[in-house]
Amino acid sequence: MDERTEGQLRLIREVISVTQAAGVSVWLFGGWGLDARIGRITREHGDVEFWLEFMHAERSKAVLVEAGATALATQPPAEACEFTWDHVPFSTAYFDRRPDGSFSQPRGRWSDWLFPPGSFGDEPGTLDGTPVPAMSVSGMLAMKEQFPRLRNGRPWRQKDINDIEILRELAAAL
């Protein structure tokens, strides 16, 4: 395992520890979320991404900064916050729960993004032998499949196409 990956794993453990101590639940998504659902590290990652409920946005930012992260003013505050911690980039994005059990990001550019019930559950993934909270397979698959059709979406990159194939295989095995 290279130094960058070790730093990202350390950051994942630290963010989870700090937010859980503050009563804030987070879920990995993106490449690290997929790796957690697969149960092993499959590739290098450019950053670490977490979802959390919008009502915890300010509290999460405050406890992460207090613990040593630096918040960056690079994203609309109603949507997400980007950080660095010991030179490792990461972000928190925000969702809201809907009455039907699904989830959305109703504020800002991604208001047409919808995630199915169960996207943010209690079943952990695994990274480097450690259980970690991760967005569900069905949630990540919905997220990836919808992206090109969103109002502000973009075409899939090759890594998105590869991720969708893996997520479909994982979903079929559930």
List PLM regions with ranges:
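Compositionally biased terminal segments of proteins
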Residues: M1-L174
